[in-house]
Amino acid sequence: MRVKDTLNLGKTKFPMRGRLPETEAQREALWEENKVYEQRQKLNEGKPSFVLHDGPPYANGPIHIGHAMNKISKDFIVRYKSMTGYRAPYVPGWDTHGLPIEHQLTKAGYDRKKMSLTEFRDLCQKYALEQVEIQKKGFKRLGVAGEWDHPYLTLAKEFEAAQIKVFGAFAKRGLLYQAKKPVYWSWSSESALAEAEVEYHDVVAKTAFFTEQVQDGKGLLDSDTYLVGWTTTPWTIPASEAVAVSADFEYALVQPSGSDRKYVVAASLLGDLAQKFNWTDYQVVKTFKGAEMEGMTTKHPYIDRELLVGLADYVTDDAGTGLVHTAPGYGDDDYNFGKKYNLPIFAPMNDQGVLTAENGPEFDGVFYQDADDISLRLLEEHDALLLEEDLEHSYPFDWRTKKPIVFRATDQWFVSIDKMRDEILKAVDEVTYYPTWGKVRLRNMLKDRGDWVISRQRVWGVPLPIFYAEDGTPIMTEETINHVSDLFREYGSNVWFDREAKDLLPAGFTSEHSPNGKFTKETDIMDVWFDSGSSHQGVLAERDYLTYPADMYLEGSDQYRGWFNSSLITSVVVSGHAPYKSVLSQGFTLDQSGKKMSKSLGNVIDPNKVVKQMGAEIIRLWVMSADTSADVRVSMETLQQISESYRKLRNTFRFLLANTSDFGPENFVAYEKREAVDQYMTVNFNHFLAGMRDEFDRYDFLNAYKHLINFVNNDLSSFYMNVAKDVLYIEPEDSHVRRSMQATFYEILSGLTKLLTPILPHTTEEVWSYMDEPEDFVQLTEIPEARTFENGNALLEKWEGFMELRSHVLKCLEEARNAKLIGRSLEASADLYLTASQQELLADLGTDAGLLCGVSALSVHDASEAPAEAESFSDNAAVLVQAAKGEVCDRCRMTKEDVGSDPAYQQLCARCAKLVRENFPQTVEEGLEK
């Protein structure tokens, strides 16, 4: 018999290498085949519900790493809730309408003007559904559990029908109105945009300081006086109707030396402006308040038009001249000013951003960006240009086409936010936010939000269910809305485009505004944010196993102005409360340098590729490790580091499995009867479990990750599993000390496997398949609640004191290793010179301190006896590490002076010789081979 045959070496077929790209897919197929998600839902029937409502990603293109972070984060929470006493169904969804899909078809060669609207919409639907399948495959491959066979789609008939009812709630409350107002206009999309569809980029603009001659100065200013205006959009000057000044500002009438003109600018800006205009010598003729200028008129610099001077509180003196050129058709503030002074709302531009002849013959047919130069030339020709200079500033862009947009007055349908702002803000306060600053972010977005333009001049979307009478009166009564909703539920929204208005109205419908019984219908569609913002009705209220409001909405922080925002508004209108009880927001995924990922920069981390190379578990563990409350940097190097952490976790599972392979329920040892170190680790694990559950409950996965890695690396790998080898391998198979440790091992193995299932379901299911448990899948078990122990806190405190002592021993061992005094720790002996209280602590452990410190011999002495060469630490205590005396035992690998003391076992220490003699008596005669 060989020495190793006398050892209880752990055995398991659980592989060291996970081969994740291959095995994960097999496991996912097994889950699908066995309907594990459905089984979990059935198990949770009758339990309190927790509904995380999925914010629908846009159905266009394969999933990216931001998608992965979002969906995996949701999966953590849903799986955790499902395994801790909640019924937590998860219905994934997709946003399937909108301009990008139209663009994709145009790019593919389809011309929507050469086919019927329904034909084009059918192509859009086909494309959207194809994209849903592509993304669905990607999400499922990440291990995300949910109703993949029954997701929600904003193009679904029942969703569209519910959305029409939401629109009806706005109509019923009188919150909808039609107006010609400046809106964000995307010439590249040929449509109005909502605030949530706009992003800002820094651009360099041509700015102009220009003059307008006073025509009627109200006795305060003469006709040789010129008001100095400033604009960052010279192309809007042809549409100028007025000059805005601040009532409270002090304005200066300035006469530059050698000039026959006088100029008016804000007094606070005069110093800077004089420098800009090279007014080296000038006289301030007089100063006056802006309020005195109200009602004056000036001449347009190059068009035969009189301009009004009026008062506005949006005028500032932090840039420009303190006098603002005002074109009511090209800006929100300008529009409100125009309404106040009854000015024409003039925006002479077509849908493609091309100026019309109303601007003047020079501008007819000119793209607005090219019109800057024409306007500047005309200013110069009319001696009205004081200065042209470039300015870098933030400018709005269409978030989808990445092209600049304009403010342009067009006829649109709006939701009046002002009428319900107080209700909306009250609803904000009733929600819990993770992180807490989310409340302020959302509140500020809604506090300052303008009216919501909900009409879009596009084809692929849900039509505005508005009819028009013969005299132009809009019709959207409860009767017509409900009828359209019913039609959509039966036929889908294509019916709106297929039928005439009369065939979409209820049978026999009449209106006093249509004496001849003729009606027309609206051709615009709804903003897609109205689509997704209605999902609380289209999904939560539509499916009886979900709850409204949802327990949580979880999305990127951009959704404070997007989905969180639109959903809140629609929900308040429909039911008077928020659609969610809590909101969790996340940052964006960036590359390792903090840059946005883009194919052109070559810095994209493609989750589909990572899954094929490394496995979904690596992405999942990375998500757990990331501070998702802020922007998250990720690179292949990051994922490589995470794969190292994964390898340690996997090896831990493997060690626990191997060393419990011969352990069954009949071998169980109750906590009270366990050895001291096992009692400590039982309490310690439950303390860890309680902390992890608390962090999961608070959605603090980052700290949970830190605690997990710390527990696995330090408590298990560096300490307990190290100590365990001497017990599990060396002691008799059925000895109490070994079974005590195995009982603890198994509890940790079982608890850790269940606890990590929300995070690493592929791996924990693999581990579970090697455990002898009644449930076929670990997902169908419950995460255990942490146990409490009567002496638990005192025990942890005592062992914490010992761990402090042990850390000093380990430090000295490392120094001895570096000095080549020893190789392995078991080649060392340690002499501890301790205070009385420290000696008492060691004696009270009830365990061999040498074994716990990983040395072959440990002696305890009084602190006063410490020799000079001993390394001191707290309370005058000291440690002296030396090479252990004796020979290495072939069985336990300890260095002992009693090796060979039993003549039958010359290569074994006395302890091992005794154990072998008792358990393998045949070896006394046969002997042992190395």
From Swiss-Prot:
Pfam families: Anticodon_1, tRNA-synt_1, zf-FPG_IleRS. Binds 1 zinc ion per subunit. The lineage of its organism: Bacteria, Bacillati, Bacillota, Bacilli, Lactobacillales. This is Isoleucine--tRNA ligase. L-isoleucyl-5'-AMP binds at residue 555. It is found in: Cytoplasm. Belongs to the class-I aminoacyl-tRNA synthetase family. IleS type 1 subfamily. One of its GO terms (biological process) is isoleucyl-tRNA aminoacylation. It catalyses: tRNA(Ile) + L-isoleucine + ATP = L-isoleucyl-tRNA(Ile) + AMP + diphosphate. Keywords: Aminoacyl-tRNA synthetase, ATP-binding, Cytoplasm, Ligase, Metal-binding, Nucleotide-binding, Protein biosynthesis, Zinc. Its cofactor is Zn(2+). Catalyzes the attachment of isoleucine to tRNA(Ile). As IleRS can inadvertently accommodate and process structurally similar amino acids such as valine, to avoid such errors it has two additional distinct tRNA(Ile)-dependent editing activities. One activity is designated as 'pretransfer' editing and involves the hydrolysis of activated Val-AMP. The other activity is designated 'posttransfer' editing and involves deacylation of mischarged Val-tRNA(Ile). NCBIfam families: ileS (TIGR00392). ATP binds at residue 599. InterPro entries: aa-tRNA-synth_I_CS (IPR001412), aa-tRNA-synth_Ia (IPR002300), Anticodon_Ile_BEm (IPR033708), Ile-tRNA-ligase (IPR002301), Ile-tRNA-ligase_type1 (IPR023585), Ile-tRNA_ligase (IPR050081), M/V/L/I-tRNA-synth_anticd-bd (IPR013155), Rossmann-like_a/b/a_fold (IPR014729). Residues 1-21 are annotated as: Disordered. A motif ('KMSKS' region) lies at residues 596-600. Zn(2+) binds at residues 889, 892, 909, 912. IleRS has two distinct active sites: one for aminoacylation and one for editing. The misactivated valine is translocated from the active site to the editing site, which sterically excludes the correctly activated isoleucine. The single editing site contains two valyl binding pockets, one specific for each substrate (Val-AMP or Val-tRNA(Ile)). GO terms for cellular component: cytosol. It comes from Limosilactobacillus fermentum (strain NBRC 3956 / LMG 18251). Monomer. Its EC number is 6.1.1.5. One of its GO terms (molecular function) is ATP binding. A motif ('HIGH' region) lies at residues 57-67.
